């Protein structure tokens, strides 16, 4: 999943750092890890379906440096 943050495209490709809540077998609230084209890592809360990040809460995106 691709999200724009501060003028950069951030790619969340399924790397999960933590699972916060589970709503059945195919819907998990997670902390997702992504990166931009420069290799900078980002963290955000999102929804994971067991294979892919399906939604990112854009107001939770943080730059990890």
Ranges and model annotations:
Residues 5-12:
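Short glycine-aromatic motifs
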């Amino acid at each position: 999943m691709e999200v724009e943050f501060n003028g950069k495209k951030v790619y969340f490709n399924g790397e999960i750092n933590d699972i916060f809540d589970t709503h059945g077998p195919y819907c998990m609230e997670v902390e997702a890890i992504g990166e931009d084209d420069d290799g900078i890592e980002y963290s955000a809360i999102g929804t994971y379906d067991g294979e892919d990040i399906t939604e990112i809460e854009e107001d939770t995106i943080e730059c990890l440096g």
